[in-house]
Structures are given as structure tokens and as C-alpha cells.
């Protein structure tokens, strides 16, 4: 059968989509570039916040409305797990597959290969029984091998998911309710996948998880992430980039910092979601409230790696956030001088403890605070980027284009920029995608750098 996969949401979803892609291809099914060509369309759904669920339902309805006779539509992943009845209720969805069932995609497609009988309104869709995650008991990580995964990349960067699920129970977050507790991928499986990616031409491996710094706890590892990184650096070439995303601060140990500083492969970059900086707000979030400790960690990271780029995300307008608490967040940003920051407007998620908190902040106030925070951070990011003007930085080229005057221009990223969420480096001239070149920075904006390649 011909299949087409649509991926919504985060990089962790992209990894699962690649896993389904690999499993299907090993059974002789053929990937096609568009939904119109496919016999089976698979939508890997997102359930992060209400806006993501609305987008998921919109995509499902649009694809269902364009289905031709005999074409099948599968809703897989997070929203299929968290809101199964809502997803299955979309007329035209033929089957659902939860977050811990995606390795059974071939079994489900096999069910759908039977002669087509049009579904009548209200008729149950096909499904693989969902794994129960409400009991909080971790199950083993989905056992998929690198040989099953076909990694076809438009860029020389690949995500590698080292665990799934999360042991934290932040008051605003629904993820554990449909992902379950953390399940770490064994070290050997991570190493094998990394080697497979490098052999396929990948130059940058981005490690992702719901909670990266908790990696290996369920495997009995102490400082599991540091252990994994040291072993990864033994099996990857020195010029490979290894980037860390979603590293919660209370899991950042002295050993991890030392490991990051010791190997050339590990990017001096850390994505460290903080969510807020006022102790009272953090307590309501059910997160560690020690902001002073966070500042000490930032100082230790910069002492070990003076050029490190630190990224974080914050939530504005969390229930009960007073003017004083918001101003404390702004003061923290002034003190921390983070290189990259993203901010979410608080989204009230049904079923979370935060949704029941008193003193919900008015949408107009949330919007005003979001803009104020982002204006402040833009000035900080601009100042941080200006420090690179006149310096040389290695750039991973990802594509080519032309400037307004028609001059050739190459587009890439430095170690300071994660794929899709951070800035870019624009280099005069035409250089092949996948190459790493030294660039002298000549200009900087708040988000991007410009420069000349050095011969």
C-alpha cells in the first residue's frame, strides 16, 4: 500500500513518525509525497495544549473531507491517546493508534487492507487497544531497532529520542496523562541508532525527551545522561554535533557539566525549560522553587563553557501570577542574560490542577505580559548576539538561496542554534548542504548572524 505521514507537534513526534515510516517500509509499503497519492494517510497528532488539539482536529477534518473512495485515514499519537473519542468522532477517521502503540502500525494497516466497507455515521473505527497510562506504572520503551527506521532528511540534522513519558507532575501539564511515566531507551539502543544516523550522513544529533536529565533513572543509572553522552562520544566522529534539548535544571549535575565541556561533539548549548522565576508561582506549578539554585547552575555552565548558549521557555499569565511575580520574572531575565527565550501564554487545560486554581489571569493581561517579556528578551538576545561580531564560528550549512540583490547566499546554523526554534547564520556564497565551514561574523540581529566564509 502507498502511505503518507503527516506529523503535528514536537520533534519527539517526528521521531515516532520516522519509526512508523521505517516499520511500514520494511513490510513493502511505499511512502508517497502527498496525501492525494496515498492509500493510507497517517496523522501523528498533537495534544500539547488546546490550540494544538484544535489544529489536529482541523487537519483530520480537512484530510477526511478530501478522501477518495477506498482511501483510509489513521489518527495516531498523542491526541488519539488523550482524547480518543473526540478523534474517533471525526467523520472519515478509519482507525486510531495511541502513543505506545505506534510500533503496531503494520498490524493496523493490515486490518485496513481488507475490502473497504464505507463507515456509517457513529460506527466504531478500527483501533489497537490503548495502553493504560493512568496507573503511573512505567512500561518498557518501545523496542524498535535502527534497522527498521528509514531516516530520510532534508537537512543534515536528526532528532534522537532517548526516553518517552515523564515522572514529573507539573500542575499545568497533561503529558503524563497520555504518555505515562518515563521509559528510557537502553544505552546500547541509543548508541546503535546514533551510529546508524551518522552512517547515513547526519552531522547533528539532537537528543530529545520529555525530561532529558532524568534519563536512565528507570534503568538504575546514576547520572544517566552524563553516562550516555560519554559513550555517545566514543562512537561518533569528533566533528559530529550532539545537542541537548529539554534538560530540566534540577537534573543538571556537576558531572553532566564536566562531560559537556570535555567532548568536542557536545554542543555548548543547553535548552533548559524553567517556566517561571518567582518561588510562589513555581510552587503553584508544582516545580522546584529555588531560583537562586537555577542561577548558580547557569553560572556553573558558563564557567565551564564560556561560549555556551542557554535557551529557556517560560509561561506568562499562570493562575495567580501577580504583577509582582511577573516583574520578578523580568528581573530574573535581566540577571540571567539567557541567549534564547520562548514564552507561552498560559493555556487552561481541563483535567490539570492548574485549571482549578483561583485567580485565573485575564487574557488581555496575559497578552500584555507576553509582549513585555518578549520585548525585554529581544534586547538581551541582541546584546548576546553582538558579542559574536568579528569572531569566527563554525556553521552547518542547511540550504542555499539568494539575497535581494541576487547574490548567492547559504543558510545554516551554528552550535548556538537548535533546528526550527532558534536563529540562523547567513553566509555569502554558495556552499553545499551538510558541510561545516568556518564563518567570520560581520553582522548580528537579535536572532540571526551574517558572515563571510573563511577559506
UniProtKB/Swiss-Prot annotation:
Cofactor binding annotation: Binds 2 [4Fe-4S] clusters. One cluster is coordinated with 3 cysteines and an exchangeable S-adenosyl-L-methionine.
Enzyme Commission designation: 2.8.4.4
Ligand binding ([4Fe-4S] cluster 2): 166, 170, 173
Residues annotated to bind [4Fe-4S] cluster 1: 10, 46, 78
Alphabetized GO MF terms: 4 iron, 4 sulfur cluster binding; aspartic acid methylthiotransferase activity; metal ion binding; protein methylthiotransferase activity
GO biological process: tRNA modification
Domain Radical SAM core: start-end pairs: 152-383
Subcellular location field: Cytoplasm
Function: Catalyzes the methylthiolation of an aspartic acid residue of ribosomal protein uS12.
Protein name: Ribosomal protein uS12 methylthiotransferase RimO
Native organism: Chloroflexus aurantiacus (strain ATCC 29366 / DSM 635 / J-10-fl)
Protein encoded by which gene: rimO
Amino acid at each position: 500500500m502507498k502511505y503518507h505521514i503527516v506529523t503535528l507537534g514536537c520533534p519527539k513526534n517526528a521521531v515516532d513518525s520516522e519509526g512508523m515510516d521505517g516499520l511500514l517500509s520494511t513490510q513493502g509499503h511505499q511512502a508517497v509525497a502527498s496525501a492525494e497519492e496515498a492509500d493510507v494517510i497517517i496523522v501523528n497528532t498533537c495534544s500539547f495544549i488546546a490550540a494544538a488539539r484544535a489544529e489536529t482536529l482541523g487537519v483530520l477534518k480537512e484530510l477526511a473531507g478530501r478522501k477518495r473512495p477506498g482511501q483510509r485515514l489513521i489518527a495516531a499519537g498523542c491526541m488519539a491517546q488523550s482524547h480518543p473519542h473526540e478523534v474517533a468522532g471525526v467523520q472519515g477517521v478509519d482507525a486510531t493508534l495511541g502513543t505506545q502503540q505506534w510500533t503496531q502500525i503494520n498490524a493496523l494497516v493490515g486490518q485496513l487492507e481488507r475490502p473497504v466497507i464505507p463507515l456509517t455515521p457513529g460506527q466504531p473505527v478500527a483501533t489497537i487497544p490503548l495502553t493504560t497510562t493512568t496507573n503511573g506504572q512505567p512500561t518498557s520503551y518501545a523496542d524498535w531497532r535502527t534497522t527498521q527506521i528509514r531516516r530520510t532528511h532534508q537537512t543534515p540534522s536528526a532528532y534522537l529520542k532517548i526516553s518517552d513519558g515523564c515522572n514529573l507532575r507539573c500542575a499545568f501539564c497533561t503529558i503524563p496523562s497520555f504518555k505515562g511515566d518515563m521509559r528510557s531507551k537502553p544505552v546500547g539502543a541509543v548508541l546503535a541508532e546514533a551510529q546508524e544516523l551518522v552512517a547515513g550522513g547526519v552531522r547533528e544529533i539532537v537528543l530529545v525527551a520529555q525530561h532529558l536529565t532524568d534519563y536512565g533513572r528507570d534503568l538504575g543509572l546514576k547520572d544517566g545522561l552524563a553516562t550516555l553522552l560519554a559513550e555517545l562520544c566514543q562512537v561518533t566522529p569528533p566533528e559530529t554535533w550532539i545537542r541537548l534539548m529539554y534538560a530540566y535544571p534540577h537534573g543538571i549535575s556537576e558531572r553532566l557539566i564536566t562531560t559537556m565541556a570535555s567532548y568536542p561533539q557536545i554542543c555548548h548549548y543547553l535548552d533548559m525549560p524553567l517556566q517561571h522565576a518567582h518561588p510562589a508561582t513555581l510552587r503553584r506549578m508544582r516545580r522546584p522553587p529555588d531560583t537562586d539554585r537555577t542561577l548558580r547552575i547557569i553560572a556553573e555552565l558558563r564557567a565551564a563553557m564560556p561560549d555556551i548558549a542557554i535557551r529557556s521557555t517560560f509561561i506568562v499569565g499562570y493562575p495567580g501570577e501577580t504583577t509582582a511575580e511577573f516583574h520578578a520574572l523580568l528581573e530574573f531575565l535581566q540577571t540571567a542574560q539567557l541567549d534564547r527565550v520562548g514564552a507561552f501564554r498560559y493555556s487552561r487545560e481541563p483535567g490539570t490542577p492548574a485549571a482549578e486554581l483561583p485567580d485565573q489571569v485575564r487574557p488581555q493581561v496575559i497578552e500584555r505580559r507576553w509582549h513585555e517579556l518578549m520585548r525585554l528578551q529581544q534586547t538581551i538576545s541582541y546584546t548576546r548576539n553582538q558579542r559574536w561580531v568579528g569572531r569566527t564560528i563554525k556553521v552547518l550549512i542547511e540550504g542555499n538561496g539568494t539575497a535581494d540583490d541576487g547574490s548567492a547566499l547559504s543558510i545554516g546554523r551554528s552550535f548556538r542554534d537548535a533546528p526550527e526554534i532558534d536563529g540562523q547564520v547567513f553566509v555569502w556564497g554558495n556552499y553545499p548542504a551538510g558541510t561545516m565551514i568556518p564563518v567570520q561574523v560581520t553582522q548580528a540581529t537579535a536572532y540571526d548572524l551574517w558572515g563571510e566564509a573563511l577559506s
